[in-house]
UniProtKB/Swiss-Prot annotation:
Alphabetized PROSITE patterns for the sequence: RNASE_H_2 (PS51975)
NCBIfam families: PRK00015.1-3 (NF000595), PRK00015.2-2 (NF000598), PRK00015.2-4 (NF000600)
Localization terms from the record: Cytoplasm
Cofactor note: Manganese or magnesium. Binds 1 divalent metal ion per monomer in the absence of substrate. May bind a second metal ion after substrate binding.
Domain RNase H type-2: 30-221
Alphabetized Pfam families for the sequence: RNase_HII (PF01351)
Name this protein carries in UniProt: Ribonuclease HII
EC number: 3.1.26.4
Task performed by this protein: Endonuclease that specifically degrades the RNA of RNA-DNA hybrids.
Cofactor(s) essential for the protein: Mn(2+); Mg(2+)
Manganese recorded as keyword: yes
Amino acid sequence: MSTSWPPRTVIRKASGLRTLELTLDRVGLGPVAGVDEAGRGACAGPLVIAACVLGSNQRKSLAALNDSKKLTEKMRETLFPLICRYAEAYHVVSVPADEVDRIGVHVANIEGMRRAVAGLGVKPGYVLTDGFRVPGLPVPSLPVIGGDASAACIAAASVLAKVSRDRVMVNMDSDHPGYGFAVHKGYSTAVHTEALRRLGPSAQHRQSFVNVRNAAMGSSLMRPLAPRESDTGG
């Protein structure tokens, strides 16, 4: 029995990295945009979302493309300019930590994906997202489980989002020294936790995260009390 397109349920696996896009293109639903994020689980720094439409004839140029989480940092940095060069369109959106705090990580992720798709230079006919549905898109969309390892356009978006965010965190390390942002990129490592305990949260930390709130409470308890007027001799 043949599979109908577009599919109406979550896709869990594709036979090749370009299978979904090429099939959607063949039935007139292209161009296909992939969307992914970086920094969802971090307790500091922005949430970065990218949308990308790949050209159908760029398979050889982007042969090394894969799930960005499986690529080394050097490989991602090598792929980044190639994706920017060969993509039909791409757009990267950054949602700052204070906005993530205000509306929540999940809502920020959904809103960021909408903004990323809206910012594309070409209008997609279909959108593939990594793992969950994105309501409110102006075109049909479908979540793909493990999308950054199953669809080339999502894998490209994953690289764009991760490299863009990593660069932000390296720059942030200069503005907020002592936290090690350039190393752990804002995720809750042992080194980051110790820096939070010692320094307290910075303006780039997500105050809605439990470990950041705990660090803020701890640093305020350790802060010396201001002297009373009677103790100053005034």
